[in-house]
Amino acid sequence: MSQQPKYRFYPTLLDSFQNYVDSDSIWDKYYGTSEDPSISVEEFHDQKRRDLIDNINRVEHESSEAAAKGTCLNEIVDRIIMKQKSSESNVIVKTVRDFDTCVGAFNSVVKDENSEDASELAKETITRINQPFIFASVDGFRFCFDIAFCKEVANYFSDCLCQYRTSATLPTSKGEVELYGYIDYLREKSIFDLKTTKSYSFGNYSKYNQRHAYPYCMEESGMMSEVRDFEFTAYQLSGGNSRTPLITGKQNKEVYTYSRSQSVEILTENCERFIDFINDNISEIDIEKTKIFKDR
């Protein structure tokens, strides 16, 4: 008889742990060739450790522009696929075809205390873009997406099931672990995760735990009899600045054939190492806020 899970992990939390483990090599990749790096390898290591502890404790951080941009594109694509004009998401999405709708879009996010004039912003935006676009805003960031680009992305994921929650239990020598999370897009025997990036090179997502956890969860839970592959569909975005406000992008596909035995081995090792880290640093974990323990 199966035991109740002792821990609950989602893939990006395991990724945060992996970034901490790999902090030296990550530092070397981005700062190793600099004669005067802005951060030392020791400081970078400490930063990744702090990030991990904060993620475990569910500490809220201000969203970055890059993260907000990705969230907005995902929301736009979901609404196009599901033919929804609104959702329960906190992302504001409006199709702008003229000056008045542009003013309305900016009015929905511009706060009086910012002393910004929505009409002036709308006029400047309309003049620069000079074509209909999709306005999206979240966490104080505003973006203008090219309609044709958004439809192209949505068309690629047409007939997909969107934002599907999955979970399953993984046995480890340290205790049962519940793996869980939301799959961006699901079609037949393939699982897709939509990524946005400023620059891309193949293999960017090779160590991401999503490609192991989500297929495992879908098969283990019985929701899919077989998962063939996992695809990171990465869009390298351009635009989104004052000079070129309209955002468009280029598609890059990073596809991994799913091997259950390989993924189980990797997930088990990652979870067991993460559990060791948790036990070694239990004094820094906020038991009241964290959700990594199943029975608390």
Spans of model-derived segments:
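Mg2+/Mn2+-dependent nuclease catalytic core
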Residues: 166-277
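Secondary-structure transition/capping residues
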Residues: 84-88, 225, 285
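Amphipathic alpha-helical interaction segments
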Residues: 35, 114, 222, 266, ...
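Metal-dependent nuclease catalytic cores that hydrolyze phosphodiester bonds in DNA/RNA
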Residues: 1-182
